[in-house]
Every structure is written in structure tokens, then in C-alpha cells.
């Protein structure tokens, strides 16, 4: 009987109907906030991996997507709500993909034999969309304290005698910290240096995009929603507006040269 019920559920499943429910948006919120909290509490606070400029941007991108999901929870079937929820979700994904690709490029350059191959540098003070001073509002979350492309643990001396076995397993033992799982930086498979943090985050954003884009297309093609195409155009337009108006450039921001970063660690 359970198999029959499962087949009936699969047969009656509609992506268009599903995107009108709170479930996909709740999953989006859990994933994005969960990853952001892991980055902050586990990697930054517990394992002493300081975030760089692109890292804090990726946190912002994740939270933008989460805000879109929270808005959708109000009434996911409402077209006006959809405009804001889809727009913020796609906007966050767009930013996230850009920042992940930038971070991966920096990571490859820093760890290559030619460390001066076309990377502009790393800002000490980040520039967020619409000049949001997030680094002032929540500095522990959004102010970069690490070097670009260098995600090795930086353990303060006053913590040497307070490390537990779990921390030592990942970051190593003092004073050199060379025998930890992440002593050479974070990788999905550290022994092979396979898939750095930027690539893993890139995959996460791509997975979110695939699911959301499928939901979006199902919404647009739903015959029971005659105005869906109009609202879809509004969503696309709003994403473009957010992306291009939100970009800001402040020449007075302090920029640390990548050359100095590389020389410091060479």
C-alpha cells in the first residue's frame, strides 16, 4: 500500500503547484542560513579561518536569497509576493556566482607559480550593494579579516592552551599547526586538495539556481495563471535593476594589493 501511495504522490506532483507552497522556500532558507552560520560559527569562530573580502560577500549573497525565501513564506501563491521573493533569490544567486568565480580565480593565482597573473587585489573595507555598511552593523559577520585566497587557520597565541581534540584534528597542534586536516586550507578532500571553498559554494549557488529556475519556468508556463508571464517579466526587470543599480564604486576605499598578500606568505 505504501508503494501505491508513493506512486500516486509522484503522479500527482506538479512543480507549478509545489512552487506555490512554502516547502521549497523553507528549504532555501534553511540551506542558505545554515551555510552562512557554518561559515561564521564553525570555520571562523571555532576553527579560526578568517574570512576574506569575497567570503563576506558570499555570506551577503546567501542572506539575500534567504530574505527572498522569508518573503515567500508570507503567501507563496501571491503574484506580488512572488515578484519580491524570486527577484531577491535570483539576485542573490547572480551575485553569489560572480563572487565565487572571483574567489576561485584569486585562490588559483595565490597558489600558482605566477602569483601576479591578473588579479587586482583585495579590499580591506568591503563595498556592498547600495553601499550598505554591513561591516559596521555586524563587523564579526561582514568585515573581512583574512587575506584573499588564503584560508588556512590563524590561531591566536592566547588560544594555544585551550584547543580541544576536535579543533586540533582540523587545524593542527601548536605552535606550527602543520598536522591538521585544514592546515593547508579548506578543501572538500584536503589530502587531494580537491574542490576548494569557492568551488563548493559555486556548486551550492548553481544547485539553488537550477531548482529556482525550474520553479520559475513552471510558474510561467502554468495555464491556470494567465498573468504569470507579465509578472515574470517584472521579476526579470527587477533583478536587472537590483544588479546594475546596486553596484557601487568608491575610489576612497582602501585596497590591499594582492602582490603584498602573496609576498607576505611567500
UniProtKB/Swiss-Prot annotation:
Disulfide-linked positions: 52-55, 122-148
GO BP: protein folding
Transmembrane segments: 25-47, 62-81, 198-220, 230-247
One Gene Ontology CC term in the entry: plasma membrane
Domain of life according to the entry: Bacteria
Subcellular location: Cell inner membrane
Alphabetic keyword roster: Cell inner membrane, Cell membrane, Disulfide bond, Electron transport, Membrane, Oxidoreductase, Redox-active center, Transmembrane, Transmembrane helix, Transport
Bilayer topology: Multi-pass membrane protein
Gene3D superfamilies per the UniProt record, alphabetical: DsbB-like
GO MF: protein-disulfide reductase activity
Subunit structure of this chain's protein: Interacts with DsbL.
Family, similarity comment: Belongs to the DsbB family. DsbI subfamily.
Functional summary from the UniProt entry: Required for disulfide bond formation in some proteins. Part of a redox system composed of DsbI and DsbL that mediates formation of an essential disulfide bond in AssT.
Protein name (database record): Putative protein-disulfide oxidoreductase DsbI
Gene coding for it: dsbI
Amino acid at each position: 500500500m505504501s508503494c501505491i501511495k508513493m506512486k500516486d504522490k509522484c503522479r500527482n506532483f506538479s512543480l507549478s503547484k509545489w512552487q506555490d507552497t512554502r516547502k521549497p522556500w523553507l528549504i532555501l532558507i534553511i540551506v542558505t542560513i545554515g551555510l552562512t552560520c557554518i561559515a561564521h560559527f564553525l570555520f571562523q569562530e571555532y576553527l579560526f579561518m578568517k574570512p576574506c573580502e569575497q567570503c563576506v560577500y558570499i555570506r551577503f549573497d546567501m542572506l539575500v536569497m534567504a530574505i527572498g525565501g522569508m518573503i515567500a513564506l508570507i503567501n507563496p501563491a501571491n503574484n506580488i509576493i512572488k515578484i519580491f521573493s524570486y527577484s531577491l533569490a535570483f539576485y542573490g544567486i547572480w551575485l553569489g556566482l560572480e563572487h565565487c568565480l572571483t574567489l576561485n580565480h584569486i585562490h588559483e593565482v595565490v597558489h600558482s607559480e605566477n602569483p601576479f597573473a591578473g588579479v587586482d587585489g583585495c579590499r580591506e573595507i568591503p563595498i556592498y550593494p547600495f553601499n550598505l555598511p554591513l561591516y559596521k552593523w555586524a563587523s564579526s559577520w561582514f568585515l573581512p579579516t583574512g587575506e584573499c585566497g588564503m584560508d588556512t587557520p590563524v590561531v591566536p597565541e592566547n588560544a594555544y592552551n585551550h584547543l580541544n581534540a576536535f579543533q586540533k584534528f582540523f587545524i593542527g597542534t601548536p605552535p606550527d599547526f602543520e598536522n591538521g586536516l585544514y592546515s593547508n586550507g579548506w578543501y572538500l578532500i584536503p589530502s587531494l586538495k580537491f574542490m576548494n571553498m569557492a568551488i563548493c559554494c559555486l556548486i551550492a549557488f548553481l544547485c539553488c539556481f537550477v531548482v529556482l529556475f525550474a520553479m520559475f519556468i513552471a510558474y510561467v508556463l502554468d495555464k491556470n495563471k494567465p498573468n504569470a508571464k507579465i509578472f515574470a517579466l517584472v521579476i526579470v526587470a527587477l533583478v536587472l535593476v537590483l544588479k546594475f543599480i546596486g553596484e557601487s564604486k568608491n575610489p576612497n576605499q582602501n585596497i590591499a594589493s594582492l602582490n603584498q598578500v602573496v609576498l607576505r606568505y611567500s
